[in-house]
Every structure is written in C-alpha cells, then in structure tokens.
C-alpha cells in the first residue's frame, strides 16, 4: 500500500475504525498513539504531535531528571502508509509503523527507524543491500488464582508433546501473523518449559525490523486471548532463556556472502564477520540492552559467552549455518546469536550493519573459526585463539559503546547520546534494586 486512499479503502472493507501508530523508543518498549480512520490523511500528511521527552524514558517509564529532553519540545509521529496492516487480534483496529520527524518535517535525529533507513541507503550506495531475518524466542505461561506461575509443558525441545500442548495458541498466533502478511517460515518448541521459537522470512533490514515489532505485538496479544501470558524476556525464569538470532547477508543482485568459486562464504562475508567481532562488546549494548540480557549470555546456554565465530557452532557469537543443499547461493548467511527481543530492532541492526561494514571497509581478517564449544578450551587455548569473554553486564557493554566511534557515527550523536542516557538509567536502577523485582517487572513489559 502506498497512499492513504488504499488504507482507507481497506479500513472500510474490513470495518476498521482505529489505527494504532506504532513506534519503539531506545528503551525497546513498543509504544503507540491511536487515531480514528477519519484522521488518517492528516496523520500521514502532517503527523501526530509527540513529546520529545518520550525518547528518554526507560522500560520502567522513568527518566533522568537531568535529561537532554524535558517538558518543552515536540516532534511529529508520521505513519508510513506502506506498513498498514489490519490487526486480526484487535476488533476493528489496524496499525502502521511510524517515523518521527521534526516540526519542520525533517527526519528527527533521535528516531531509530529513520536512522536505520539512512544506514541502509548508505550501504545501497556502496552496492550492498542487506537481507535480514529474525528468529524470535518467547515463553508462554499462565497464572492460577493465587498468582502462581504455570509454565505448561515440561517435554522439551522439538517434542510432539510440547507441540500438542500449545497447538491452539500457536496456531492462532501463526494465523494472526499471516493475516498481516508476515512470512512465517518455521515454528518449534524450545529447550525449556513453555519456550517457543518462530522464524520469519528474509527482507530488507527495515522491513524485517518492522515485522519483528508486529510479531512481538501479535504474540503477546493473541497469547493473552488464549489464556497465556507471553514474554520475550531473555531470562524470564531461573532456567531457560529467550534469544533473537539475527540472520544477515548482503546482496548486489547476487548474494555477496557466497563465493561461487569455492562454494564457501566469501571474502566479503569474512570481513563482515571480522568487523562484528571487532566491535562486539559495543554492539551488545544495542542488541542485548537490558540487565536481564546478560543472564542469558553465559557459557553453555546455547547463546554466546565468548567473542568468536564458527561453522554450525551454537556457542559462538556468530554462527555460519549450513546453507540449503542446492540453494547455496541464495541461503548462505551469518547468524548473530548475541541479540534478544528487548532490543530496539532498528538500533540492533544499525549496530550490526555498521560494525560489519567497518570490517569490509578496513578489509579485516577474522580469526580462525572455532569448531568446538569455547567453554571446552582452556584459558591458554582461548588466549592463543584470540577468544575473549563477552561483556558480563550491561554496564560493561555500555562502557564499550561509549568509546566506540564507529557506532557513534552510525547512530549519529543525538541518538547515540539519548540511547546511552536511557540505558545508563536502566543500569542505575538495577544496581539500586533487587534482581527478582526487576525480572518480575521486565517479564510483563517484554
């Protein structure tokens, strides 16, 4: 859809009265304003007024009183009509994803969606177009009358028993995603009670990030209608974790990550990997942006505990998956395993793409791939292979981000500073409160 007449026609056909204008702040929490369908022309043409200060609220709706933004200052929330979707889980409602613009109509420097668009434009000018897909993990649970949590099945990953136990809820989620035009590729239960994973198709970075936000909204909304609560929190319980693996390749008519002469990943892919590894501690501040994230990024958690890469290695930060047989040229990609669903997906992709592009521009060579669980190596062996530990707290990751000029330039100084402010406030709240209290609140937010 490219104009408001198409949006209004679809709203009339499907009896839609309310349109949610969705956006996500540096906190990673999805926000919305809602307009009546009669206001859609005005919303697209002129935007909807939004306070600047919303961008520096953290996940708990708190902000630093010495913030760069305060009660004075407004911007415009500008819906993109091409992103319009009816919401099958919300009666007479639709949604559009939004950019944020200044009162003069220019892209606001603190808007993450506009910033990702700029990064992708710069890459396309160099002949590289990203293709991205998210693998989203989440947990379904319910509460009894006393508030006690019931996590459902105990069967484990890939078991048909687990599939049977939540079949109706998952089917309703998949139906709702497909009704919004989201390309669902795979689903399976995962390695802890009530944990599930949905994989969606490859798109441009912007389209993939947009769909990821719609998926998060859909899963939580449909699960609630089926009597569950869904959480994407990285470590919602004492056991089990939820990640968000990000699959990336770069294209220029053909897949630039595939070397047809050797049937292997290309030099471009290796340079991209090297760049991500080089900037990994700082990138993590964008892709694993909550205190809870670092409870997941531990050795032997099937996530990543160390900065390394490897073929088929699920304990490496970057895994090179096996390509589809007979479709190697189309399916060769890398999988970044250090992300989770508390991230603002636009910012996470900016970090990954900027780091990888820096590796290409500097023609970096990655270290040798790691073919074992890095936990099985001795300290001396890891040192010899150049394998370092990932940041173990959000504070450490933010320290790395604040000194990283490549990511500062990619985000732009205003967005960079606003993001650091929000996450420093989040880190400060954690250091002043109990971890169990944090997890309980974050489990509901994400």
UniProtKB/Swiss-Prot annotation:
Induction: Expression is induced in complex medium (CM) in which putrescine is both nitrogen (N) and carbon (C) source, in defined media (DM) with putrescine as the N source and glucose as the C source, DM with ammonium or nitrate as the N source and glucose as the C source, and in nitrogen starvation media (NS) without the N source and glucose as the C source (at protein level). Not expressed in CM in which yeast extract is both the N and the C source (at protein level). Disruption phenotype: No glutamate-putrescine ligase activity in complex medium (CM) in which putrescine is both nitrogen (N) and carbon (C) source, in defined media (DM) with putrescine as the N source and glucose as the C source nor in DM with nitrate as the N source and glucose as the C source. It is an enzyme of class 6 (ligase). It comes from the Archaea. Mg(2+) 1 binds at residues 135, 245, 335. Keywords: ATP-binding, Ligase, Magnesium, Metal-binding, Nucleotide-binding. Mg(2+) 2 binds at residues 137, 190, 197. L-glutamate binds at residues 296, 314, 337. ATP binds at residues 249, 314, 319. Pathway: Amine and polyamine degradation; putrescine degradation; 4-aminobutanoate from putrescine. Its cofactor is Mg(2+). Binds 2 Mg(2+) ions per subunit. It holds the Pfam family Gln-synt_N_2. GO terms for molecular function: ATP binding; glutamine synthetase activity; metal ion binding. Residues 14-105 form the GS beta-grasp domain. Residues 112-446 form the GS catalytic domain. It catalyses: putrescine + L-glutamate + ATP = gamma-L-glutamylputrescine + ADP + phosphate + H(+). SMART domains: Gln-synt_C. Involved in the breakdown of putrescine via the biosynthesis of gamma-L-glutamylputrescine. Not required for glutamine synthesis. Is not able to compensate for the loss of glutamine synthetase. Belongs to the glutamine synthetase family. Dodecamer. This is Gamma-glutamylputrescine synthetase.
């Amino acid at each position: 859809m490219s104009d408001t007449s198409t949006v209004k026609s679809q709203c009339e056909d499907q009896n839609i009265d309310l349109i949610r204008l969705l956006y996500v702040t540096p906190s990673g929490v999805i926000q919305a304003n809602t307009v009546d369908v009669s206001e859609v022309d005005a919303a697209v043409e002129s935007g909807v007024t939004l306070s600047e200060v919303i961008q520096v609220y953290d996940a708990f709706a708190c902000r630093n009183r010495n913030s760069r933004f305060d009660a004075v200052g407004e911007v415009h929330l500008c819906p993109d009509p091409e992103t319009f979707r009816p919401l099958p889980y919300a009666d007479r409602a639709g949604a559009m994803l939004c950019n944020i613009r200044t009162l003069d109509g220019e892209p606001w420097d603190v808007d993450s969606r506009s910033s990702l668009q700029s990064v992708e434009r710069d890459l396309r000018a160099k002949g590289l177009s990203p293709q991205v897909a998210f693998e989203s993990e989440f947990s379904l649970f319910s509460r009894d009358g006393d508030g006690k949590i019931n996590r459902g099945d105990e069967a484990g990953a890939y078991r048909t028993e687990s599939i049977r136990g939540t079949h109706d809820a998952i089917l309703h989620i998949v139906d709702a995603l497909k009704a919004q035009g989201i390309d669902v590729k795979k689903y399976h239960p995962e390695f802890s009670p009530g944990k599930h994973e949905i994989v969606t198709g490859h798109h441009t970075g912007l389209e993939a990030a947009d769909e990821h936000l719609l998926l998060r909204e859909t899963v939580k909304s449909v699960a609630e209608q089926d009597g569950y609560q869904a959480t994407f929190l990285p470590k919602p319980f004492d056991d089990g974790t939820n990640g968000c693996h990000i699959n990336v390749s770069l294209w220029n008519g053909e897949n630039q990550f595939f070397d047809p002469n050797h049937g292997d990943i290309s030099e471009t892919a290796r340079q991209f990997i090297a760049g991500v590894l080089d900037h990994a501690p700082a990138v993590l501040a964008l892709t694993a942006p909550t205190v809870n994230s670092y409870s997941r990024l531990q050795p032997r958690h099937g996530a990543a505990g160390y900065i390394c890469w490897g073929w088929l290695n699920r304990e490496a930060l970057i895994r090179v998956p096996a390509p589809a047989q007979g479709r190697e040229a189309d399916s060769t990609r890398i999988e970044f395993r250090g992300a989770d669903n508390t991230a603002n997906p636009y910012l996470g992709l900016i970090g990954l793409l900027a780091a990888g592009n820096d590796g290409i521009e500097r023609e970096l060579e990655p270290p040798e791939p790691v073919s074992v669980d890095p936990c099985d190596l001795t300290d001396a062996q890891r040192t010899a292979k150049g394998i370092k530990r990932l940041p173990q707290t959000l504070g450490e990751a933010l320290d790395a981000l604040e000194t990283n000029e490549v990511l500062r330039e990619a985000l732009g100084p205003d967005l960079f500073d606003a993001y650091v402010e929000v996450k420093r406030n989040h880190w400060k709240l954690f250091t002043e409160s109990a971890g169990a209290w944090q997890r309980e609140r974050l489990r509901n937010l994400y």
